[in-house]
Each structure stands twice: as C-alpha cells, then as structure tokens.
A protein has these predicted regions:
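Glycine-rich, charge-decorated loop segments at or immediately adjacent to ligand/cofactor-binding or catalytic sites
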Residues: 41-46, 116-138
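Glycine/threonine-rich flexible loop motifs
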Residues: 89-101
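Glycine-rich, aromatic-lined ligand/substrate-binding cores of catalytic
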Residues: 181-258
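Conserved functional hotspot residues or short segments at active or partner-binding sites
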Residues: 228, 232-330, 348
C-alpha cells in the first residue's frame, strides 16, 4: 500500500518521528501532508506554507490547499492508497489541525482512500465549554458545529464527523482509529513537544481557550514574549502594575503591539487547578474592553469567528458579566455532551 501521512513535528514515537519509523520498517511512504505551521512546526500562525520536500527523507510534502475549496488536488490524492493521521491537537475549535484533518477526510471520501488515525490524548480533554459554532461563522478557525472546548481526541472527533455526516455533501470516509492505551478523559496529559510556536508549555495550552479572543482585538496576548497566551495588555491600558514589550521572535515575527510597552495582566502564576476550575473565562477580555473604552473599535469581525456566535460581543457591550454570558451557552454544552457520547472511545 502507498502511504501518505498527515503529521508535523509532534508525530513522535519516543524520540523518533512516525515518518522515520515507517521508512525504517520498509513501508512505502509516498507523501506528507502538513498543517498550519508546516511539517517541522516552525512557521508563524496563518503563514503560507508551500509544498516542498522533507530534507531529511526526500519524501514530498504536499499542500493541503492546492486544490479547489481548500482541499488537496486530484493529482495529490491519486498518489496514495491510505492516509495515516498522527498529529497532536489541543482540543479547541479554533486550533486548525482538526479542520485540516476534516478536509483530508473529505478528499479521501471523494477519492475512495482509507484513513487511519493514530490517536493521541487531548490536553484539554477533561471538560466541554463554550458555545456551539453557529455555522454562518464557519471558517478556517471554526469548521464544525462543536463548542470551543469539545473535549474529544482527534480519533473521537473523526468518528463523530463521519457519524453525524458533517463532511460536505454528507460524505463519509473509510475510517479506522487506533485508540490510546490507558487513557481516560480525566487523564492529565502533559505534551512532550509544543504543538505550535506560540503554545510553548502547558500553561499556554490551558489558558488558550480564555485568551485567544484577544487575537480579534488590539490587545496583545503575549505573542513575541516568553508568555504567549498567558498575559494580556495594551499601551493605553491604565491602572496595572504589570507591563511587557512584544518583540520579533521565531514563530511571532510581527506580533501585535511590536516594540510597544504594554500594560496589563500576567496570568502565568495562576495554578493549573484554578484555570481548569474556571474553564473558559471571558473576564480577561471584558476587563480589557472596559479599561480601553474603545467601544466599537475594540472587537474586529474575527471575534465572532473565534467565539462562534453573535451574542457574546453583544452581551459584553451590554455590560454583562463572564458568568452571565457562560450561563447562555450552558445548554449548548449539555446538548453536545449527549450528541458526542456514541463516539467517545475513552471513559469520561
């Protein structure tokens, strides 16, 4: 069988990469698909990653986006028989690796290729939180009608995509999932490798569901510092003792508020337990919104793509608290937990 892999720098088995292990064992690996950040995981968020060849092995790296509607081209799809997926996700609707997997599942359904997911734990797999995506906001940072924190592994999510017929034209693909051993949704799994340049450690990964929304505002969330997604601030925020200055660094070449002294809040000293207890905490965004007093100039339209619904911005502008907003999506969370149950491979 001719094998293509969908993976990146996180596809490690011990200290060896899946690609090297397959080649050592004489498997016929003919192509690599790489997601956002590239196969070696060093490209900036949203940066264009072109097709190339893996320097170490000579296996061609194919673009996910060279065909129509953000799918691989027919020529790419004809090169292989089975797609092996091995990539570390962080379990959030706006983290793009799952959307790339879904596009590949769709292409495999169309061209009758098998898909095999080598499952990995979800470091945010112990809870479900956030509104279900209103599909009028479907985008590269929101591809499925799921909550912001869906609490599923990529294997479980793949099964759900097939079972709920979420692929375009209700297609399903020939899917097999190899589950993780000794894993439950309450297993706290610390990632051995940062999944992307701005999620360097577990603190960033745990705070990401609460701080990512700053991407849709003028506020810096610490890109270009040692604490991405763990701090927030802006040159015009007042009354804070903490400050930081974003710099140009690998993985954040041109971060928001580059070179400017930002005043704000450092969340990096919060305990993991406190972060888990709060789940998605909109109080940080609300705090910055009220402090900057920019009214309509605070949120860009990208905010709705991230949060997935139109009522959150409205409620923040009406002066509602984080708790009041969270109460509004409670039903979404309960509904989704019931809907996903048939697809769970691991104990909740």
């Amino acid at each position: 069988k001719r094998i293509a892999i969908f993976s990146n720098h996180t596809g490690m088995i011990g200290d060896k990469h899946l690609l090297d292990i397959l080649l050592e064992n004489k498997f016929n690996v003919v192509a690599i698909f790489s997601p956002e950040h590239g196969f070696r995981g060093d490209a900036d968020a949203g940066e264009h990653v072109s097709s190339s060849v893996d320097k170490k092995t000579g296996v061609p790296i194919l673009s996910l986006y060279d065909g129509k509607s953000g799918k691989p081209s027919e020529a790419s799809m004809r090169k292989f028989d089975i797609l092996v997926v091995d990539i570390q996700d962080v379990g959030l609707r706006f983290y793009t690796y799952y959307a790339s997997m879904c596009r590949l599942m769709d292409a495999c359904a169309e061209y009758n290729r098998k898909v095999l997911i080598l499952d990995r734990p979800n470091p945010n797999g112990h809870y479900v939180d956030g509104p279900i995506l209103d599909m009028k906001y479907k985008s590269g940072v929101g591809w499925l009608p799921i909550p912001v924190v869906h609490g599923m592994t990529l294997g479980e999510l793949g099964l759900m995509v097939n079972g709920e017929r979420w692929l375009p034209a209700s297609r399903t693909c020939d899917l097999t999932v190899i589950p993780c051993k000794n894993y439950t949704h309450q297993t706290l799994y610390k990632l051995p490798i940062p999944p992307s340049p701005n999620l360097p450690n577990m603190k960033s990964i745990y705070l990401y569901p609460s701080t990512c929304y700053f991407e849709a505002t003028p506020v810096s969330l610490g890109r270009g510092t040692d604490l991405p997604f763990q701090v927030y601030g802006h040159p015009n925020m007042t009354g804070y003792s903490y400050s930081f200055t974003p710099r140009s660094v690998p993985g954040a070449k041109n971060p928001p508020q580059l070179g400017k002294l930002c005043h704000g809040v450092n969340l990096s000293n919060m305990s993991d337990e406190e972060i888990w207890k709060r789940g998605i905490d909109l109080s940080y965004v609300i705090d910055a919104y009220r402090n900057l007093n920019m009214d309509d100039h605070f949120f860009r339209s990208f905010f709705e793509l991230l949060i997935g619904t139109d009522y959150v911005r409205k409620m923040i502008k009406e002066g509602k608290s984080a708790e009041e907003i969270k109460a509004r999506w409670k039903d979404d969370v309960e509904k989704f937990k019931v809907q996903r149950k048939p697809y769970l491979l691991y104990e909740e």
